[in-house]
Amino acid sequence: MSKIILTGDRPTGRLHIGHYVGSLRRRVQLQNTGDFDEIYIMIADAQALTDNFDNPEKVRSNIGEVALDYMAAGLDPEKSTIFIQSMIPELTELTFYYMNLVTVSRLQRNPTVKAEITMRNFEASIPAGFLCYPISQTADITAFKATTVPVGEDQLPMLEQAKEIVHKFNSIYEPVLVEPEILLPENEACMRLPGTDGKAKMSKSLGNCIYLADSPADIKTKIMSMFTDPLHIQVSDPGHIEGNTVFTYLDAFCTDEHFERYLPDYKNLDELKEHYKRGGLGDMKIKKFLNNVMQEELEPIRLRREELAKNMDYVYDVLKKGTETVSYTHLTLPTNR
């Protein structure tokens, strides 16, 4: 069996570092290992319309922005096929058929769907398309016979429901659908990076994001205003690591080499944490260190993005060719014939 990756993002805005550590960075690593036969990266514009149906221009205009972020972060069109979901009508067709395998009550019990409904204030009037989001994801995964799906922790219930649909389809008809393996981020901090304000989720709508395209000045401003430990008032006070956003970000981005370059008084993050917990280490010092780490990580991405943005014709040509490749060459709906 071919080893195939499918993953993607909804084009509702530029990508932020939550997307980056949650999935995008891992995609680039997997792409460059050469261990997979095919890697498909989907810009899920059709799914984005399920809660942006009254603002299609927002979705349309952000397709190019997401593609810029992809390539700036290191996704190579020669190694990964980047395509636009809405241009593949077979995915919508398969979604329709899979709807017969899932009850409305099961969709409503999906923890991710429930959380998203609450966040968007859809409780009184849930769009049917939004409720069927997990079914659409299942169609995407199975149409490409994906064996591996890199996701953030918040998407786990979606993938579990996809597996349920695969099992039911295979038991009713024939075992032709591939059940995908779930690939989570490398550590707990990367699974669900909190917003800069300490809230549980980094979200465009909450204004608590650091974007891949942010300027150095914007990144620094956001880091310096980040939530830390409200009880750590004096430098001498013992501090708490748990729930401290600065340390969560360091867990996601920091390596021992960063200490050699920017904070040589410490060998690694464990030593820094122990000093903070004892007291005698100020929030400003760790924020300055985080700023150095983040600037180093994001600068090459930002510079590549700025260069790519000078030639949007090339960016859209990549999307056109990727979508054509999927449409005419690789996409095969499930069959045993």
List the predicted regions and their residue ranges.
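N-terminal Rossmann-like or analogous alpha/beta NTP/dinucleotide-binding catalytic cores
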Residues: 2-139, 295-298, 302, 306
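A non-catalytic, amphipathic alpha-helix used as a structural packing/dimerization or gating element
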Residues: 61-65, 69, 161-164, 289-296, ...
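Active-site cores that bind ATP or allylic diphosphates and position pyrophosphate for catalysis
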Residues: 114-295
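Conserved small/polar residues in nucleotide/adenosyl-binding loops
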Residues: 329-335
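Active-site catalytic microenvironments for nucleophilic, acid-base chemistry
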Residues: 26-29, 33, 165-172, 332
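Short His/Asp/Glu-rich catalytic/ion-coordination signatures at enzyme active sites or charged loops
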Residues: 16, 271-281, 299-327
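Residue-level preference for non-acidic, small/hydrophobic
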Residues: 16, 70, 154, 249, ...
